[in-house]
Amino acid sequence: MQSSVNEFLTPRHIDVQVVSPTRAKITLEPLERGFGHTLGNALRRILLSSMPGCAVVEAEIDGVLHEYSAIEGVQEDVIEILLNLKGLAIKLHGRDEVTLTLSKKGSGVVTAADIQLDHDVEIVNPDHVIANLASNGALNMKLVVARGRGYEPADSRQSDEDESRSIGRLQLDSSFSPVRRIAYVVENARVEQRTNLDKLVIDLETNGTLDPEEAIRRAATILQQQLAAFVDLKGDSEPVVVEQEDEIDPILLRPVDDLELTVRSANCLKAENIYYIGDLIQRTEVELLKTPNLGKKSLTEIKDVLASRGLSLGMRLDNWPPASLKKDDKATA
């Protein structure tokens, strides 16, 4: 197989093996020799450190002043309860922080299903055990759930407000990442007479709040955005004003008609002045459900179509709409 020294192979075979709802194996081949480790390690680091998610950041338990306490009638001590709270898989739809309550008494197991949820909060693992109560036991607590990224120790959230914080509000080290495990291996691949190529196999497991395939797409998008600066690398010999407009993904400038939604969904979006994909992804699920004639079926359709393009609802665009889009709108008018 003859090829130019400036031409590189790109994966022509992509296989996604769904092992379980929370685990998948993604295989890409062929890759030039060495690119398996280059891409695999970069994606692995992003998946572990940069995926946004939700976690319990603070807990307030009735009758507890500090984490080294014990609660009468509760099998676990407070430290064990806090560790169990870290295992909750929570999704927030439309909000960055929410306070939840849990109240249970009498003999039995306290699970995530006992937490009282708001309409825009979802717990993916309702069977997750938090504590075990005896007949005389009772557990009442408030949980603060926040959206974040990566790992955040409790002391990093300390501020001047700590002095005024009431005693008994326990801070938790929080792992926001929905990725529970990520591993990759590089195997040999062959294309015609070339036998020194790479095959990248990524084994990814999440906590259920994020689909494994979507996690890969988001990680690849982050990597692409970070590398974009190197593509148009320029020196600082002249002061250059960098317009945020240049960083906008071209797909966001396309009309929502390009998503090929059903007529009902498309008309509902236009009725809300949502004409571009960039307009759509900034809306939350809660906001869209308030749209007349747009139900959960249409919402699911919109989410699936966006996910197929590596996008999702509730994304933030600081520089939207871009100046060029405004000019086009004026010209059309």
Swiss-Prot record:
Where is the stretch described as Alpha C-terminal domain (alpha-CTD)? Answer: 248-333
- List, alphabetically, the SUPFAM superfamilies matched: C-terminal domain of RNA polymerase alpha subunit, Insert subdomain of RNA polymerase alpha subunit, RBP11-like subunits of RNA polymerase
Any Gene Ontology biological process: DNA-templated transcription
Record keyword Acetylation present: no
**What's the record's remark on domains?**
The N-terminal domain is essential for RNAP assembly and basal transcription, whereas the C-terminal domain is involved in interaction with transcriptional regulators and with upstream promoter elements.
Catalytic activity reported? RNA(n) + a ribonucleoside 5'-triphosphate = RNA(n+1) + diphosphate
Recorded GO cellular component terms are: cytoplasm; DNA-directed RNA polymerase complex
Matches recorded under NCBIfam families = PRK05182.1-2 (NF003513), PRK05182.2-5 (NF003519), rpoA (TIGR02027)
In terms of InterPro entries, this protein maps to:
DNA-dir_RNA_pol_insert, DNA-dir_RNA_pol_RpoA/D/Rpb3, DNA-dir_RpoA, RBP11-like, RNAP_asu_C, RNApol_insert_sf
Q: Name one GO molecular function term.
A: DNA-directed RNA polymerase activity
Give a yes or no for keyword Transferase in this entry: yes
Key words of the record: DNA-directed RNA polymerase, Nucleotidyltransferase, Transcription, Transferase
Per its record, how is this protein called by name? DNA-directed RNA polymerase subunit alpha
The UniProt family comment states: Belongs to the RNA polymerase alpha chain family.
Q: Per the UniProt record, which residue ranges are transmembrane? A: none
Biological function: DNA-dependent RNA polymerase catalyzes the transcription of DNA into RNA using the four ribonucleoside triphosphates as substrates.
Q: What is its EC number?
A: 2.7.7.6
Q: How does it assemble?
A: Homodimer. The RNAP catalytic core consists of 2 alpha, 1 beta, 1 beta' and 1 omega subunit. When a sigma factor is associated with the core the holoenzyme is formed, which can initiate transcription.
Q: Where is this region: Alpha N-terminal domain (alpha-NTD)?
A: 1-234
Among Pfam families, the record links this protein to: RNA_pol_A_bac (PF01000), RNA_pol_A_CTD (PF03118), RNA_pol_L (PF01193)
